[in-house]
């Protein structure tokens, strides 16, 4: 059963055409890796599905009650936001907070009160991963999830994704 339907989309930036009459159906258990060189529309496709950009024409439909979590290649690192507030998106749900604390510790970010502005690039990427993974989602949209990660974190992420039961669309330049 398709949970995402992309039908006849077109997207261009000025003269640069990325998609012209593109269509794709995504099943609830699909694991799709999108590999390619810069400027070919990989990140744009995820942005279109996530709803952060609009196609010039065509439709993208996500089935009812499908929860989507999106890890952008460039993420907002609000400078004075504390780590726990960032990864939980300010929720007060105790279950989400407990899960966030576990995942922060597992990914080497135990100081939940630290400001994002004080984190290194790799730590910010790990914080963005925690934010993406803590709440249940049926679909993970992951744009360059291994950028700024060391080999141990990449290995952890690979294991996590191998055990993930939902749909994954992953964009990368690497063939790992």
PLM regions and their residue ranges:
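ABC ATP-binding cassette signature C-motif
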Residues: 1-176
């Amino acid at each position: 059963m398709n949970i995402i339907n992309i039908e006849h989309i077109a997207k261009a930036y000025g003269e640069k055409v990325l998609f012209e009459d593109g269509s794709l159906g995504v099943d609830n258990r699909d694991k799709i890796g999108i590999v390619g060189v810069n400027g070919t529309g990989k990140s744009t496709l995820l942005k279109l599905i996530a709803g952060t950009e609009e196609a010039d024409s065509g439709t993208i439909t996500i089935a009812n009650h499908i929860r989507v979590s999106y890890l952008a290649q460039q993420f907002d690192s609000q400078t004075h936001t504390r780590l726990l507030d960032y990864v939980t998106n300010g929720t007060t749900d105790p279950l989400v907070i407990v899960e966030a604390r576990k995942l922060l510790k597992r990914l080497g970010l135990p100081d939940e009160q630290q400001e994002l502005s004080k984190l290194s690039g790799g730590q910010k990427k790990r914080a963005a991963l925690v934010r993406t993974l803590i709440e249940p989602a049926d679909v993970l949209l992951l744009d360059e999830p291994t950028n700024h990660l060391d080999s141990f974190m990449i290995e952890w992420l690979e294991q996590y994704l191998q055990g993930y039961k939902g749909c994954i669309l992953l964009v990368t330049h690497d063939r790992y």
